[in-house]
Swiss-Prot record:
GO molecular function list: dihydroorotase activity; zinc ion binding
GO CC annotation: cytosol
NCBIfam families: pyrC_dimer
Keyword Nuclease listed: no
UniProt function note: Catalyzes the reversible cyclization of carbamoyl aspartate to dihydroorotate.
Keyword Iron among UniProt keywords: no
Organism: Pseudomonas putida (strain GB-1)
EC code(s) of this entry: 3.5.2.3
InterPro entries on file: Amidohydro-rel (IPR006680), DHOdimr (IPR004721), Dihydroorotase_CS (IPR002195), Metal_Hydrolase (IPR032466)
Swiss-Prot/TrEMBL keywords: Hydrolase, Metal-binding, Pyrimidine biosynthesis, Zinc
Required co-factors: Zn(2+)
HAMAP family named among the record's database cross-references: PyrC_classII
Record: residues binding Zn(2+) 1: 14, 16, 100, 248
Name the record gives this protein: Dihydroorotase
């Protein structure tokens, strides 16, 4: 078994960078490993049009480390009021690569999200016409639906209908967490793909809840039972190009996580590819990591793969207990724990 693993430089097809004083920290972490990233638009206020996307992009570019060529790929936040003209203008801007469907109330800063998918059918039709992917946070939000069932219910109530109604639309089922979602994507047409996070490959709800509540494992969609974790590992390591890397790295200040009503989100950008390598190694599937991390995503988006490389070495190191986050700190996933792979920084 080799102690070195060289991959074409990967991209992150789903990340939260936040805004303001924290950007130098979050952008620095993602740029360390990834060439490009799909930037989530759930700011306050959200990124609703091409002009707002352009302004946010400039703030991200200004926060890049010296010499970095990291490229943010911007995303439009869909609301009930998003028009086909908004979609066409976003496409014409050349900097917006997708549009994001957040059901209202599904996750952090989603209050401006879509209250009924039917409300945005004209915008979705425009997405299909211009060839821009629809990114979907696939959970229903009705209070009577159990939090562990919300992804499956979304598939049954909405996802199948959208895919059937818009057969040419590229759809990314983001951060899938269930065997139901993995099966749906596998059986769907080629224009339907999915991202999978490192935490959903490495952990299940027992890790979050047994022996005490661990708030830094709490994210949305929530970790599920181990049978779903196994199904996600099967999908990610299968070599199926429908599945690709999306960290959903989502930082919150320590006090916002370690609280009586803590925020959802795991911060993984600082060591994401190292964590994915651990998950793939558990399946003896390190040979499949480059496809998942570096090839499948660009192919789905119709973009070229990166040509430079990164190298991981099998070397234990201890994750930091906390990281700077503006004037505060963020506790990363795996804080204080050993990681088995390390990125050679000279290749970053």
């Amino acid at each position: 078994m080799s102690d070195r693993l060289t991959l074409l430089r990967p991209d992150d097809w789903h990340i939260h960078l936040r805004d303001g004083a924290v950007l130098p920290h979050t952008v620095g972490d993602v740029a360390r490993t990834f060439a490009r990233a799909i930037i989530m638009p759930n700011l306050v206020p959200p990124v609703r049009n091409a002009a707002e996307a352009g302004a946010y992009r400039e703030r991200i570019l200004a926060a890049r480390p010296a010499g970095s060529r990291f490229e943010p790929l911007m995303v439009l936040y869909l609301t009930d009021r998003t028009s086909p003209e908004d979609v066409r203008a976003a496409k014409a801007s050349g900097i917006v690569y997708a549009a994001k469907l957040y059901p209202a109330g599904a996750t952090t800063n989603s209050d401006s999200g879509v209250t009924s998918i039917d409300n945005i059918f004209p915008a979705i039709e425009a997405l299909a016409e211009v060839g821009m992917p629809l990114l979907v946070h696939g959970e229903v939000t009705r209070s009577e639906i159990d939090v562990f069932d919300r992804e499956k219910r979304f598939i049954d109530e909405h996802m199948r209908r959208v895919v059937e109604r818009f057969p040419t639309l590229k759809v990314v089922f983001e951060h899938i967490t269930t065997s139901d979602a993995a099966q749906f994507v596998t059986e769907a047409p080629a224009n339907v793909g999915a991202t999978i996070t490192a935490q959903h490959l490495l952990y299940n709800r027992n890790h979050m809840l047994v022996g005490g509540i661990r708030p830094h494992f709490y994210c949305l969609p929530i970790l599920k039972r181990n049978t779903h974790q196994v199904a996600l590992l099967d999908a990610a390591t299968s070599g199926n190009p429908k599945f690709f890397l999306g960290t959903d790295s989502a930082p919150h200040a320590r006090h916002a996580k370690e609280a009586a009503c803590g925020c959802a989100g795991c911060y993984t950008a600082y060591a994401a590819i190292e964590m994915y390598a651990e998950a793939f190694e558990q399946r003896n599937a390190l040979d499949k990591l480059e496809g998942f991390a570096s090839l499948h995503g660009p192919a789905f988006y119709g973009l070229p793969a990166n040509t430079d490389t990164i190298t991981l070495v099998r070397e234990e190191w201890t994750a930091p207990d906390s990281l700077p986050f503006g004037e505060q700190t963020v506790v990363p996933l795996r804080a204080g724990e050993k990681l088995r792979w390390r990125l050679l920084e000279e290749n970053a």
